[in-house]
UniProtKB/Swiss-Prot annotation:
CDD domains in UniProt: KOW_RPL26
Record's keyword terms, sorted: Ribonucleoprotein, Ribosomal protein, RNA-binding, rRNA-binding
Protein's GO biological process: translation
Organism: Synechococcus sp. (strain CC9605)
Name listed for the protein in its UniProt record: Large ribosomal subunit protein uL24
Family: Belongs to the universal ribosomal protein uL24 family.
Gene name per UniProt: rplX
Highest taxon in the source lineage: Bacteria
Length: 118
């Protein structure tokens, strides 16, 4: 009896409403409650990198003669579902909705505060 080979299931890409430069709050995980600016989005992986959140340490070997190794601390990515857009004026996290203006342009708006993001 032959065994079937299994392929790694590709994650479905979700529509990300978070962009680089947005302020977000972490809503799940070890850094729950922390806020920070989005440094980078990884839409194909459904992940974001937030400033000062989910810090990881990495050991680097010396690359050149006479150089010493070092320990580097950097931000690791978080899943996009674990962060929520944050209003710095009202100090509250909120879901986001897409609003179509009369001229046909799309804007992002926080549901709790009504604040327009772009």
């Amino acid at each position: 009896m032959a065994t079937a080979t299994t392929k790694a299931k590709a994650t479905e890409r979700i529509k990300m409403r978070i962009r680089k430069g947005d302020t977000v709050q972490v809503i799940a995980g070890k850094d729950k409650g922390k806020t920070g600016a989005v440094l980078r989005t990884l839409p194909n992986e459904n992940r974001v990198v937030v400033e000062g959140v989910n810090m990881r340490t990495r050991h680097e070997k010396p690359t050149q003669e006479g150089e010493t190794g070092r320990i580097v601390t950097e931000e690791a990515s978080l899943h996009a579902s674990n962060v929520m857009l944050y209003s710095t004026d009202k100090k509250v996290a909120s879901r986001v909705e897409i609003v179509v203006e009369k001229d046909g342009t799309k804007k992002r708006r926080l549901k709790k505060t009504g604040e327009v993001l772009d």
